[in-house]
Amino acid sequence: MHTYGVVECSRQITQRMGLPEEDRQLAQLIGLLHDIGRFEQLKRYNSFEPNTMDHASFGVQILFEEGMIRQFVQDNTWDSIIRTAIAKHSDYKLEGIEDSRELMHARIIRDADKLDNCRVKLEDPIETMLGVSAEEVGKTKISPEVMEQVYRKESILSQTRKTKMDYWVSYLAYFFDINYEATFQIIREQNYVDRLINRIPYSNPETVAKMEEVRSIIHF
């Protein structure tokens, strides 16, 4: 399950960073709670698509306005850190955080979320993620607007994705938004970049060439 995968990724990242035990435990708690708004999104809309609702904001509402956070931690000492990290974990860009510890935990959960998403994208059926077979995905092209964002080493804006390959490239573009060397170490050790790129059998010649460009740009 993704939630527990994020908890484990948070543990690994904070351990490699050499953080104090309190911050390690706090990062794992944030990992456990970061997608709590997803359950309501699924209940209401039967979808995880970002245009149905802001699951991060709803998670904050459930935890702090409705008081569910006290079921997980009695002390309110860390409420501001937890609230900020969860509220910001799915933002396109991480902005507007002035407190250094809040910023650190917001960066950790974003890294851990993306790191476990690598596992998810390798293990889940392509049909489940994209609605068609891997072979069908590999027949499609990458839109110029999406490639321009890759060239700029930016995450892909959801509204610019038009083809199935656009969606697949958007998963790879997560790597442009990694914050910590500890996370990069795990990505390299697991060979996630090549494994994800190689999962799709590309048959469109233009796509084959573009994906080699993507590979060379992302590799670090």
Question: PLM features: what roles do these ranges have?
Answer:
Residues 4, 8, 12-21, 33, ...:
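Divalent metal-dependent phosphate-bond-processing catalytic cores, especially two-metal-ion Mg2+/Mn2+ enzymes
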Residues 5-13, 53-68:
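An active-site-proximal "capping" alpha-helix that borders the catalytic cofactor pocket
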Residues 15-18, 41-45, 68, 155:
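Short, flexible helix-adjacent loops and helix caps
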Residues 18-29, 69-87, 101-108:
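Acidic/histidine metal-binding catalytic segments
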Residues 24-51, 59, 80-92:
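His-Asp-centered metal-binding catalytic motifs of divalent-metal-dependent phosphohydrolases/nucleases
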Residues 46-54, 70-74:
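Short coil/turn segments at secondary-structure boundaries
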